[in-house]
A protein has these predicted regions:
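Positively charged, low-complexity/disordered segments
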Residues: 242-244
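A conserved beta-strand-loop-helix scaffold within acyl/acetyltransferase catalytic domains
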Residues: 6-48, 54-64, 139-150, 159-161, ...
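Acyl-donor-binding surface of acyltransferase catalytic domains
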Residues: 85-187
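Conserved donor-binding loop and adjoining core beta-sheet/short helix segment
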Residues: 33-119, 240
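Conserved aromatic-histidine-acidic binding/catalytic patches
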Residues: 80, 122, 191
Length: 244
């Protein structure tokens, strides 16, 4: 039997989320502290008393008492369990109505296609069936969008995992670019708040050059403070005394 609880503790929420394959920073309880211009709520879902799903919700108040609800990179659950998925979606609809939400936007990490280690890209065989079932439950899918503005979180990601990285497997041009940068005095520096001023200055220059709007220094400071032991700034620093 499935049940749910609104307002679970941050400890219980994080303990469950961190143990799941879909664990994501945006579903951590601390993300509500970063997005402090939204209200937030945590919902736990249970099967016979054992937690099987979680949703960290961001709630934006609108005029006339309405709201919108956003669950970034969540809910966290086993999407292959359609019975559980049905219960979670119905619960979120009920929760949305209680908050007078115009809509509840979910944003789970469901991989459609991936390429690992430079191999041929492979389609995930099960994801389409999950999407079909979500549609049957009344969920609207944004589709395989291509423009950045079409989604809140990036739909396409390029991840290189440390355990899989091999310099020799990089394309020849990439390896040459790295060697050239190193020889010219470009070094990778990883740090924290001591790099914040330099990093913020670079972001501002990027804004001016590209004609876009990025986050400001205070936002990066908030991330470093909120995730003190898990957040870092990576900068490429140039020193002119290296070999020409």
């Amino acid at each position: 039997m499935y049940t749910y609880k609104i307002g679970i503790s941050s400890e219980a929420h994080d303990q469950f989320v961190l143990a799941q394959p879909q664990a994501d920073l945006l579903q951590s309880s601390n993300w509500g502290k970063v997005k402090d211009n939204w209200e937030h709520e945590r919902i736990g879902f249970y099967e016979d008393g054992i937690q099987v799903a979680a949703a960290a919700c961001l709630i934006r108040k609108l005029p006339l008492g309405f709201t919108i609800i956003y669950i970034p990179r969540g809910p966290i659950m086993d999407y292959a369990n359609f019975e559980l998925l049905d219960f979670v979606v119905k619960t979120l609809k009920t929760f949305g109505k209680s908050k007078r939400a115009l809509f509840v936007k979910i944003d789970p990490s469901l991989v459609i296609k991936q390429t690992l280690g430079g191999k041929k890209s492979e389609e995930n065989e099960f994801t389409p069936s999950i999407i079909t079932f979500l549609k049957e439950l009344g969920v609207e899918w944004s589709g395989r969008t291509k423009e950045l503005e079409d989604t809140i979180q990036p739909r396409v990601q390029a991840n290189i995992y440390a355990k899989d990285f091999d310099f020799d497997s990089l394309p020849k041009k990439a390896k040459q670019s790295i060697r050239t940068a190193t020889n010219k005095g470009v070094n990778i520096t990883i740090g924290g708040t001591e790099l914040l001023d330099d990093f913020s200055t670079l972001m501002k220059k990027t804004e001016d050059r590209k004609g876009i709007i990025l986050r400001g220094k205070s936002y990066y400071q908030k991330l470093l403070n909120t995730y003190a032991s898990h957040s870092y700034i990576t900068c490429l620093l140039y020193t002119s005394d290296a070999a020409d």
